[in-house]
Design a protein with these regions (language model features):
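Short, surface-exposed, polar/charged, turn-prone segments marking secondary-structure boundaries
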Residues: 1, 35-39, 71-74, 94-98
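Alpha/beta enzyme core
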Residues: 1-39, 53-58, 62-64, 82, ...
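Hydrophobic faces of well-ordered beta-strands that scaffold small-molecule active sites
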Residues: 8-10, 43-47, 65-69
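Active-site-proximal loop/turn and secondary-structure-junction residues that shape catalytic pockets
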Residues: 12-16, 49-51, 71-75
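Residues that cap or flank secondary-structure elements
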Residues: 22, 47-48
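Electropositive phosphate-/nucleotide-binding environments in soluble metabolic enzymes
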Residues: 24-28, 53, 71, 75, ...
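A hydrophobic, small-residue-rich beta->alpha segment in the mid-to-C-terminal subdomain
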Residues: 63-91
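Flexible, glycine/charged-enriched surface loops at secondary-structure junctions
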Residues: 90-106, 122-126
Length: 126
């Protein structure tokens, strides 16, 4: 269908942020219906953080081509930075230098993105 858009991000049970313990999962029935109506239009899954890998892979099989996992990146950054400070590394030498203080968080985001690229099957693709 020609909707005049390049990507479609529809709600199929996904949310931004952390998922509650009683989350019911993605609605693949809804995703399939959307894919049937939109044809080859690339679909986006917002709120990818915390969605089980098997659901992510099924969503990809049903046409999702972009998955947002910003919350997961932020959480990994915060955890690594917190650990750096809790270990007192910011008090050693010039550990307070923002380049040193923020480096563990940067590395954590990079590791998270690499892991997600593997899961999403996007390694080696432009």
């Amino acid at each position: 269908a020609d909707l005049g858009i390049d990507f479609l991000a529809a709600g199929i049970g996904n949310i931004h942020g952390k998922y509650p313990a009683n989350w019911k999962g993605l609605s693949f029935e809804t995703l399939d219906a959307i894919q049937q109506l939109t044809g080859d239009m690339p679909l986006v899954l917002h709120g990818g953080t915390g969605i089980p890998t098997d659901m992510i892979k099924k969503a990809i099989d049903l046409g999702v081509s972009k998955i947002n996992v910003n919350t997961e990146c932020q959480l990994s950054f915060a955890e690594a930075t917190r650990k750096y400070i809790e270990e007192g590394k910011d008090q050693q030498g010039k550990g307070y230098d923002p380049r040193k203080l923020l480096a563990p968080g940067f590395d954590a985001i990079k590791a998270t993105v690499k892991e997600k690229m593997e899961i999403f099957g996007s390694v080696g693709k432009a």
